[in-house]
Amino acid sequence: MASVQGLIKIVAITGGVWLSGKITAHSLVSVPALLQTRSADGLSPCTILRVWRRIYEQGHRHSPQIAACTSTAFAYLAWCASDRTPRLLYGTAACSVMGIVPYTLLFMGPTNSRLLERSAAEEEKVPGATRGEDMVNVPSEMTTEELLSHWRFLAGIRGLLPLAGGILGLFAALYSNEGAR
């Protein structure tokens, strides 16, 4: 029978890796598909922004809570660790996973704000936005496609934080199991 601590290890490691996949999927799949649809099918910036905003809202709604639960599990494992190495690895894993929050605020915040402002402005002028023209009345030197490409890059980096946490947690678990033999 598995111990509670063993189950927490599984939840923490899987949570970090799963969250990384969730975040990275937007960078590697969703946004490239939007950009390709824009260029290949002539979809309007309004529609592209509307879909991006829904993707963003789903991530914004769930990712911080998943990161908090995963980080809490790693912090608990660090607190329970009797040896210094797993304690440091689990502690670093907790910080790495929770690092998506300050990373998002500091590095992605300006791009998120521009895209959300542009999306709101496009929503207000929906009848004219369906012609496939990019906005000219939002103060920004970047086009919608450039902003989305930049967001894609930043989100790709963001996805590495929980992945690093999951890998560090796995190393800590393996180190702990090796020491138990």
Curated annotation (Swiss-Prot):
Keywords assigned by UniProt, alphabetized: Membrane, Monooxygenase, Oxidoreductase, Transmembrane, Transmembrane helix
Expression tissues: Endocrocin is specifically produced in conidia.
Membrane topology: Multi-pass membrane protein
Induction details: Expression is positively regulated by the transcription factors brlA and laeA.
Pfam families, alphabetized: Anthrone_oxy
Recorded GO MF terms: monooxygenase activity
BP term (GO), one: endocrocin biosynthetic process
Signal sequence, renumbered to the chain: none
EC number(s) per entry: 1.-.-.-
Main location: membrane
Root EC class: oxidoreductase
Gene null: resulting phenotype: Leads to unstable anthrone production and abolishes the production of endocrocin.
TM annotation in the entry: 1-21, 65-81, 88-108, 153-173
Functional summary from the UniProt entry: Anthrone oxygenase; part of the gene cluster that mediates the biosynthesis of endocrocin, a simple anthraquinone interesting for many biotechnological applications. The pathway begins with the synthesis of atrochrysone thioester by the polyketide synthase (PKS) encA. The atrochrysone carboxyl ACP thioesterase encB then breaks the thioester bond and releases the atrochrysone carboxylic acid from encA. The atrochrysone carboxylic acid is then converted to endocrocin anthrone which is further oxidized into endocrocin by the anthrone oxygenase encC.
UniProt family annotation: Belongs to the anthrone oxygenase family.
Name the record gives this protein: Anthrone oxygenase encC
